[in-house]
């Protein structure tokens, strides 16, 4: 594979710095240390440098450039944040449609996402087939429009006492554009152009078109405004599959063998069409108060890959597919958030009262499929299920500044009420039916539909009260203290707290540290989601595989217990340094201990299970079962380094940024097999090798990046080098066959040149992964007989080099 050398990287940086200069101009994407932050503190004048915990600030310009591939916010965050992982999925069920993200190597549901400081809802779809994020319902970052963003603040520390459940790894706060006097039109087009080594062929695919517009207007003379925006995206599919060697367990018939050497599978991004819309507004109603509202809407139709079905396999009828077929999953994703409130000042107090409604609806479909048990008359299109999650939040925040004990204190208190609702609905009857052909698999191929017995309808209320105070003791010492009481209708009460402090020993050097305890309550989907797969055994008897709710009586009899909240204890210690106006550096060490991490159990299988369920519940043919459980206690230790150097050079402004992150997760304790299962079979294991691998080393532990940005009146030149650390994949196929592969570290080089034609027009060309680098090829035991030569674990992905052009008009 291609690997960039240091000389190649050096040439790229030199090229970015050698352009002709016209005049000095501030780098549009540069984040300065005097940027005032609003995340993680009550103080209204804290800057990035003065924060008691690490906070990254990403500007709209940073995000716009980094998200040029597919117009994805998640991809932009991965490019810009070394502790953020956003792997590309393929052949991974629901994860092909809603990608999960990690912060500090932790689970996707252990990071809290805010929009304008208000809690963002999660997706409705449970990831049960992916590696990263298995068993979670993550926030869908790609449902947030890129052109709506003013900046993003990323708090890299536990913040449950300040923001509530989920903020174990940190908080990502998306601040929306509030400049009504600037409008913008933008369009871009790009595609992958790459050498696909497994097929020895150069390929151009993944053509992506993106268009956006936003416009605003002032409302009155008192600071009111209204701003609205729209994005349209269209992405064609990519494919990096290899040549099929025909698995030996398939029928070795002439029709099947005739497909050898062809590309029957797909490995890559699915086709996507999407629309994003947003608004942001405020209207003063008095000299000291204003109404505000904002919202986002996402409508996205996606496709996902699935394994090929051979012509003479039992999953096919040649009357329908004479040459075999590959089912295509379709996702219909609809996402909405709308927030309205009032804020202002009453006497010495600032207030903010709001209502926040968020909802995600996901419909899962299959086409180019069939239900083989229904015979050659089977339909080929199915709806396999509907999923919905809704969240309503009411907040009241009060803040007051006062002086006492020789210090300035910003005291905040408030209350929050949250209602969550989760529902699933069965798919088409044909998607889960067991037809008359008992020698054929049942249900729609590539995932049987939810049946009526799987349907869920859950809701709960959550109430909380909180208080925090940010204090400034002179010029050197500052603190943040927070406490929160949270009561869950289904889990009872939880207390969280946080103490953070910073001391400046000199203008150029300060120490900071924090300790906090945090909580993540089990999601409603982890509590109530169920799914059933059906089939026939060799004797033609109906069989079932069940993913069971922990409240299902069968699961209880197999050792399931009520899920407990995940609880963490977070420690951090670091320093910040600023040397003049040119150089700043921060280094932070952290430890996160998490008890009772939630995961999906391994499949419980065998005749002992089948007989037990039949005898005790009268349900026949249950050949496998699984459920969610509090699987393990973990410890994550790591460090994060960020450095910036600014200099006027070569006739323009130069910004060099270097970052490094390290996070290693180890298992402290693993749940034992319950007595109920040991009585059935002493070899049963609930939390095994594969799930241990998912928590510990399936994601890279290290990440390093070096970026250079140079600009003057007409040019903005940027280059970025990323190094992604190694990741390990482990499969447990049973019978002692446990293939393992560690995929080595990879480098990625990105370049962009942008030219300003006057004050309004901007043209740009660029490339990402321009050296066309790929991850290591998978070994034979993992590559599925040549069909899947690359793994989805590496953040560099398996698409190769991407080239693009962009035009923007501002007014």
Regions found by a protein language model. Give the residues of each.
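C-terminal beta-signal and adjacent terminal beta-strands/loops
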Residues: 594, 664, 721-731, 754-811
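Transmembrane beta-barrel wall of Gram-negative outer-membrane proteins
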Residues: 181-184, 198-323, 327-347, 756
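N-terminal Sec signal peptide and the immediately downstream disordered periplasmic leader
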Residues: 1-70, 74-79, 141-144, 212-217, ...
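Extracytoplasmic beta-strand/coil segments of soluble accessory domains associated
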Residues: 45, 65, 74-123
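A beta-strand signature from Gram-negative outer-membrane beta-barrel systems
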Residues: 120, 134-186
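Outer-membrane beta-barrel signature, preferentially recognizing the C-terminal barrel domain
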Residues: 274, 333-335, 450-462, 508, ...
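Gram-negative outer-membrane beta-barrel transporters
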Residues: 584, 589-731
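Outer-membrane beta-barrel transmembrane domain signature of Gram-negative proteins
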Residues: 325-338, 357, 372-478, 672-705, ...
């Amino acid at each position: 594979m291609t690997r960039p050398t240091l000389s190649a990287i050096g040439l790229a940086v030199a090229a970015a710095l050698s352009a002709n200069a016209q005049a000095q101009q501030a780098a549009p994407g540069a984040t300065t240390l005097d940027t005032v932050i609003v995340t993680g503190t009550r103080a209204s004048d804290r800057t990035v440098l003065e924060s008691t915990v690490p906070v990254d600030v990403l500007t709209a310009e940073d995000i716009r450039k980094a998200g040029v591939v597919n117009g994805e916010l998640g991809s932009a965050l991965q490019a810009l944040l070394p502790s953020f992982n956003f792997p590309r999925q393929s052949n991974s069920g629901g994860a092909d449609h809603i990608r999960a993200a990690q912060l500090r190597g932790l689970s996707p549901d252990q990071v809290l996402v805010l929009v304008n400081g208000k809690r963002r809802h999660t997706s409705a779809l449970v990831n049960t087939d992916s590696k990263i994020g298995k068993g979670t319902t993550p926030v869908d970052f790609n449902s947030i429009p890129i052109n709506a963003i003013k900046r993003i603040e990323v708090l890299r520390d536990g913040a449950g006492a300040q923001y509530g459940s989920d903020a174990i790894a940190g908080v990502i706060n998306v601040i929306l554009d509030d400049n009504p006097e600037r409008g913008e039109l933008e369009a871009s087009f790009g595609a992958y152009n790459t050498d696909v080594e497994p097929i020895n062929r150069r390929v151009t695919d993944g053509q992506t078109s993106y268009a956006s517009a936003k416009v605003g207007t002032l409302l009155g003379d008192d600071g009111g405004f209204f701003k609205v925006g729209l994005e349209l995206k269209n992405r064609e599919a990519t494919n990096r599959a290899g040549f099929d060697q025909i698995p030996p367990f398939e029928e070795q018939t002439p029709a099947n063998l005739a497909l050898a050497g062809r590309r029957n599978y797909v490995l890559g991004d699915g086709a996507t069409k999407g629309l994003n819309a947003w608004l942001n507004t405020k209207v003063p109603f008095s000299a000291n108060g204003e109404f505000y509202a904002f919202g986002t809407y996402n409508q996205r139709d996606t496709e996902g890959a699935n394994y090929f079905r051979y012509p003479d396999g039992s999953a096919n009828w040649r009357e329908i597919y004479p040459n075999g077929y590959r089912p295509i999953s379709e996702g219909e994703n609809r996402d909405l958030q709308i927030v309205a409130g009032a804020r202002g000042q009453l006497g010495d107090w600032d207030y903010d009262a709001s209502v926040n409604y968020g909802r995600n609806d996901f419909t899962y479909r299959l086409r180019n499929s069939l239900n083989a048990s229904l015979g050659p008359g089977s339909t080929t299109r199915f709806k396999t299920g509907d999923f919905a999650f809704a969240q309503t939040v009411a907040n009241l925040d009060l803040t007051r500044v006062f002086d006492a004990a020789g210090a300035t204190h910003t005291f905040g208190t408030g209350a929050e009420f949250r209602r969550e609702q989760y529902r699933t609905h069965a798919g088409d009857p044909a998607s889960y039916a067991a037809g008359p052909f008992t020698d054929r698999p049942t249900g729609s191929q590539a995932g049987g539909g939810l049946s009526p017995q799987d349907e869920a309808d859950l809701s709960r209320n959550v109430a909380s009260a909180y208080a925090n105070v940010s204090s400034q003791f002179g010029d050197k010492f500052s603190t943040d203290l927070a406490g929160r009481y949270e009561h869950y209708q289904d889990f009872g009460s939880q207390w969280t707290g946080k103490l953070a402090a910073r001391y400046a020993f000199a203008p150029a050097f300060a120490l900071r540290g924090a300790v906090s305890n945090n909580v993540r309550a089990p999601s409603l989907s982890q509590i109530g989601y169920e799914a059933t797969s059906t089939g026939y055994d060799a004797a033609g008897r109906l069989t079932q595989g069940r993913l069971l709710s922990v409240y299902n009586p069968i699961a209880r009899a197999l050792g399931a217990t009520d899920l407990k909240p995940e609880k963490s204890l977070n420690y951090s210690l670091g320093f910040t340094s600023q040397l003049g106006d040119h150089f700043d550096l921060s280094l932070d060490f952290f430890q996160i201990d998490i008890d009772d991490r939630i995961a999906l159990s391994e499949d419980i299988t065998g005749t002992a299970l089948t007989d037990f369920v039949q005898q005790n519940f009268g349900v026949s043919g249950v050949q496998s079962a699984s459920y969610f459980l509090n699987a393990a206690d973990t410890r994550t230790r790591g460090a994060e380094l960020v450095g910036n150097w600014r200099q006027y050079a070569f006739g323009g402004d130069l910004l060099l940024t270097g970052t490094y992150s390290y996070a290693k997760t180890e298992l402290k304790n693993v749940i034992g097999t319950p007595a109920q299962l040991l009585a059935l079979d002493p070899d049963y294991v609930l939390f095994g090798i594969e799930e241990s691998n998912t928590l510990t080393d399936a994601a890279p532990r290290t990440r390093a990046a070096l970026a250079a940005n140079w600009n003057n009146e007409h040019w903005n030149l940027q280059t970025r080098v990323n190094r992604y650390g190694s990741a390990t994949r482990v499969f447990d196929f049973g019978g002692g066959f446990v293939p393992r592969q560690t995929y080595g570290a990879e480098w990625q080089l990105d370049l962009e040149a942008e030219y300003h034609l006057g004050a309004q027009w901007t043209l740009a060309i660029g490339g990402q992964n321009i050296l066309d680098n790929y991850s290591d090829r998978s070994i034979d035991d993992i590559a599925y007989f040549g069909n899947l030569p690359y793994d989805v674990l590496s953040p560099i992905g398996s698409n190769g080099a991407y080239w693009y052009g962009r035009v923007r008009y501002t007014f």
